[in-house]
């Protein structure tokens, strides 16, 4: 399982939002490419993380 998240660390404040859950890395990366518009400065990012359900 892959999780797409938006991360922000600005002015010593950390925020994050889960944007989606995907069955494959390829699907997550496709959604990540569309979500890049949410990144407005160097303190922000979108990323896919692998999650092991076991």
Task: Annotate the PLM regions.
Residues 1-8:
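A short beta-strand micro-motif
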Residues 16-20, 34-54:
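Short, mixed-charge low-complexity intrinsically disordered segments
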Residues 1, 14-17:
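Short, surface-exposed coil-to-beta transition loops
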Residues 24-32:
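Short amphipathic alpha-helices within nucleic acid-binding modules
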